[in-house]
């Protein structure tokens, strides 16, 4: 066998020697070994000024191996290559490996003029299958955005993982990859290549604290960051997912992806886990999206987050979060954006919006929901000084990770898990990230109303009974202080600063108003829907999904609050 690692560091003389040794076996030569040597020789010659990537090597090696032949009598080696004109390549290899000769054919089919002129048009049929797949993906993502919220899609996929996995380890890994790639708008390989030694704690005004890690080896070889933060939907909490991952999996030595030398020693998980992730959803498709041949699996998180932010008219944030370039004013669910990793600074409100602690109002401003107390409760006591007992506990809890990841980060994770793990299955309510402001419902202090009206909060997509605390918040929101105003958050807020765990938690007092937003299913957010404010004794109307999709009703209460139907 001839693998990438066996050949990537070889000099020309070494490759020539291995080539001759392989052909001494005559017709019984090893096709895998010979195709690997030829592929590496071609890539080293053509890409003399760039790097030779492992993925490129494996792709071209497969093409060469499929049509590789050796004529012992004439010492001629023939194979098929992906270039359209292979004459120059044939001459070059014949000169480099003389006295052997090369006969290379192109796998690009020549266009027949006879066929071309007999056809109905000169339209190009190139990449027809890719266009067909893109069209299928766009259609399915469009239906996901209208008939079913993207967060509901994630929740259903998590349910599929829980019911179809055989081991806790498999469930933990699949859940981890799904959530991280979605909330970071990244490829699976970006998550895999996270350098565990770069984890650090960062303070954020809108979610309390973040964990940040660096990806040094991306597709463009420009580093980017991956973020972990609390999510208001309990099952999506990224801190808890990271804790479970560290407890279940062991660190993996960094795999070599190119001929360039990297100082990184460890990566987050093995390459095979990405393959297992794709195979799982191919075998157990939780949605028609997974059933598309060559459909988005490794890029699923990127597709979903692009669609979600595009739906909320926040495309520029998708570009910053995922480091994708976009100059097109169109839907991005196809994820056709170019790669422009450049370590862009992210606006702090982005994390509050994704976490569900902030929403986007009709004017396009990101506004707080007055949930600072809830956020502070998540981190109460977590940033206290270390003690000697915890030093021993993190080694027992996280094993080999304790030798790689910062001790401050692991203590932070362990304390957060101990305090908040019970939240995970208490309440599975999904929250909208968008305000609707209509004639019948006006926000506190808004123009056009004689007196400031109380804000209305409509819970959506409840997957079970709301917790007592959630019910109290709902009732309290109906009697919110009329004098409170919505705090508009400047998207150009100052950048987050790194906070070591030894420091005490000294957060600045914020002036966010204690106001609750209108909660509506994101997939049905429509300006044509008008809501009347509830009576003093009445109950806020519930919003769910249309009957036939999950078996729930769409505002079917006897005391219906909807005055105008949703336009489809």
From Swiss-Prot:
Residues 132-420 form the Tyr recombinase Flp-type domain. GO terms for molecular function: DNA binding. InterPro entries: DNA_brk_join_enz, Integrase-like_cat_sf, Recombinase_Flp_C, Recombinase_Flp_N. Keywords: DNA integration, DNA recombination, Plasmid. Residues 470-491 have a biased composition (Basic and acidic residues). Pfam families: Flp_C, Flp_N. The active site is at 339 (o-(3'-phospho-dna)-tyrosine intermediate). Residues 444-455 have a biased composition (Low complexity). GO terms for biological process: DNA integration; DNA recombination. Coiled coil: none annotated. PROSITE patterns: TYR_RECOMBINASE_FLP. Residues 442-517, 529-568 are annotated as: Disordered. Catalyzes the recombination between the large inverted repetitions of the plasmid. Belongs to the 'phage' integrase family. This is Recombinase Flp protein. It comes from Zygosaccharomyces bisporus.
